[in-house]
Amino acid sequence: MTPLRILISNDDGVLAEGVRCLAAAAASRGHKVTVVCPDHERSATGHGLTIHTPIRAERVDELYGPGVTAWSCSGTPADCVKLALSELLAEKPDLVLSGVNHGPNLGTDVFCSGTVAAAMEGTLEGLPALAVSVACFQWRDFQAAAELAMDVAENALADNWPNNLLLNLNIPPCHPEQMGSLRWTRLSIRHYEEQFSRRVDPHSRTYFWLAGEVVKDLETAGDGPRDWPSDVAQIETNSPSLTPIQPDLFWRGDLSALPAACVANQPVR
């Protein structure tokens, strides 16, 4: 295919092996790659933006291989993409990629994900965008995930990539020969048992570490094709999951079920 201009970001930081592997995979296919990533890990920052302190960026091409321009940015993942599109790139990219994330981004966890937020920032700017994650925090072989992400992105661009569509790709922690087939999936709803570890610092001030674990994965976060598995169920079969996401969060349920009292007897203005 014609070489693409690709912007890559993440939330694990510019030194993370996952993003370096993804950048190398894109560059090896002849694409023009620019990496703009946080200067340190910014996991679970969601779509947060930096508005009260300056954002700084510096070139770090030496961290990446040939054909990759790289920037280290002091901001959040969403900041990185915003800054790249507004200030750092000479031309608008054809594609925004985010990842490869060191850990899953499944179900309603996408609302907390810096990885998904970086891709969503591209979607909000009218660009095709894909987030890619390996569904295990301990897995360190990102080559298969990077290559599959590139295959999915290139195929989607060659076929039909609708406006306002973000593709969220999760890949099981196994080698390609052990992996099942890629399928379209729906978002699950993840419920956690929230836990806070209470501690005391040397100045006798109490502080907390947030912890917790998934206690329940519901089948779906909303209506959708019934023959599509949830993303969590797909990963549990050692098969990659591809979930279409959009920025429009409008309620798609029964409008007659909305609490009518909210707007009853309100004066017309």
Swiss-Prot record:
Cofactors required: a divalent metal cation
Binding site for a divalent metal cation: D11, D12, S43, N101
Cofactor binding description: Binds 1 divalent metal cation per subunit.
Location(s), subcellular: Cytoplasm
Family: Belongs to the SurE nucleotidase family.
HAMAP family: SurE
UniProt protein name: 5'-nucleotidase SurE
Organism this protein belongs to: Prochlorococcus marinus (strain MIT 9303)
Gene: surE
